[in-house]
Amino acid sequence: MSNLDSLVLEPIEQPLSNTPNMLSNEDRVLCNMTPLQRLYSIDEDTYEELVCVWAYSCLGNKGYTEVYRVGQAGDKGRDVLAYYDRVKGAFDLYQCKQYKSALTYSDLCGEMGKLLIYTFNNTYPIPQNYYILCPKDVSQSFVDLLSNNGKNLKIKLKNYWETVINKKVGPNWVALNEEL
């Protein structure tokens, strides 16, 4: 049994035009909100649902065969899984962050730690792509960490592994070593 089999997964079906959480163009005009304001106003669960629908309906050209929303307590850093081939374990991982301000390194270091630990322990395979979706953008200091092909981010992750990241990951922490 794979680790994915132990999760309760509901496949995302093709969205209907009369989905209750979607506003018609007329409703959008009447409520006087721009699309971005509407995106900012939804809660984190609705945001994850939106990403699932988006992955299903808009990214079909990427070759996804199945899309699942996992986001819940104990999701091991997996909010949305979009599979190219579930049998082979080929998938993209979408990490959704709906915060009131720009995403910072502190907001995300625990999630990156989970990705490293759970892929290292073969709890789930390394995703083809790891996407971080956050409507409020990312902080400039986080953008700076991503420069240099992520070398600055790797250095910070190494420096904060024992003192910060393992605490955020919880009981599944591992010591940082050359293999990891």
Residue map of PLM features:
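Mixed-charge (Asp/Glu-Lys/Arg
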Residues: 1-76, 81-180
